[in-house]
Amino acid sequence: MKLPIYFDYSATCPVDPRVAEKMMQCLTMDGNFGNPASRSHRFGWQAEEAVDTAREQVADLMNADPREIVFTSGATESDNLAIKGAARFYSKKGKHIITCKTEHKAVLDPCRQLEREGFEVTYLDPEANGLIDMAKLRDAIREDTVLMSIMHVNNEIGVIQDITAIGELCRENKIVFHVDAAQSIGKLPIDVQAMKVDLISVTSHKIYGPKGIGALYVRRKPRIRLEAQMHGGGHERGMRSGTLATHQIVGMGEAFRIAKEEMEQDRVHTLALRTRLLDGLKDMESVHINGDLEQRVSSNLNISFAFVEGESLLMALKDLAVSSGSACTSASLEPSYVLRALGLDDELAHSSIRFSFGRFSTEEEIDYAITQIRTAVEKLRDMSPLWDMHKEGIDLNSVEWAHH
């Protein structure tokens, strides 16, 4: 077993060796290095053929038409293109958008930008388990609602929203429906025909493909129109200009092909690891699981260890690569906005750790992690006067702290 152990698969995954091998074939003079937009010679034709194959592989994982796949630089760009592109195109019909407070920043920040442009955004509160109440969602819809953006799986707590039901609601009300599926693609079955989703953002590096490449699914029937955010050579049917990165696209295609074949195998593997970790920790005192445990992707576990500062625990677990919050926000010392939206107080939100497992995680690593976590938590609690007070039965909420 090699240290440190990687338990941060929700932040990114290592590239699968099979994917890396395919990518290597598209880089050098001996390989398929041409520009897919070069129509006048064989190098361009071969590159275009490789891109077309990858486009089919990406479409295949979500039961889409390859012509509905637009390649981007990743899920952040896909989210921006979907949200700003759709909102601006349909702004004559209305300027109201609905989303949720626990969305990724790549959804929340484009919404904030649209607010500066005169749009109104409703940010829904999730329930305490992280799921959205359908009645509240229905009540938020107005005459001028043009767009709804709800993520499939949350990046911090791994809960799965009922995208099929939300899709039906949006279709009934003629609202464009965007889903950020960065954390669900390749982990859960996605069928765009059954789900009635109009726009889906996906990325490659969360399912063992390379970073820097993603895609946006844009429905053709009924056709969804977008205002381009990137202008240039008119690539990707005018929706996203820029030379296509053949090696990254081929890598993404191969990662999606493998995911389709091995999705169930990966799910069973990660679920067994999560259950093992949970079984090893659940008898500890004051341990709180964040988010619904049933409606949850198998590779994620987010736990708060009360009376332990999250940052100190991260430092104590120096041989485990885990995170507090998402990778995009774990550098800040603010408590997770996702956990705050679930109603956790600052202390509990601050003491949370996200474990995420993957294809290359092992039982041996889990067993090592259990020992390390139990030792670290016990040691840190021994140093905490609050833990002593809690053990003595003092209600910490009723204590009046002196201000100096």
Swiss-Prot record:
Associated pathway: Cofactor biosynthesis; iron-sulfur cluster biosynthesis
Annotated positions of the N6-(pyridoxal phosphate)lysine modification: K206
Entry EC number(s): 2.8.1.7
One Pfam family, short name: Aminotran_5
InterPro entries found in the cross-reference section: Aminotrans_V_dom, Aminotrans_V_PyrdxlP_BS, Cys_deSase_IscS, Cysteine_dSase, PyrdxlP-dep_Trfase, PyrdxlP-dep_Trfase_major, PyrdxlP-dep_Trfase_small
Molecular function GO terms recorded: 2 iron, 2 sulfur cluster binding; cysteine desulfurase activity; metal ion binding; pyridoxal phosphate binding
Keywords, alphabetical: 2Fe-2S, Cytoplasm, Iron, Iron-sulfur, Metal-binding, Pyridoxal phosphate, Transferase
Free-text function comment from the UniProt entry: Master enzyme that delivers sulfur to a number of partners involved in Fe-S cluster assembly, tRNA modification or cofactor biosynthesis. Catalyzes the removal of elemental sulfur atoms from cysteine to produce alanine. Functions as a sulfur delivery protein for Fe-S cluster synthesis onto IscU, an Fe-S scaffold assembly protein, as well as other S acceptor proteins.
Family that this chain belongs to: Belongs to the class-V pyridoxal-phosphate-dependent aminotransferase family. NifS/IscS subfamily.
Protein name listed in UniProt: Cysteine desulfurase IscS
Organism of provenance: Photobacterium profundum (strain SS9)
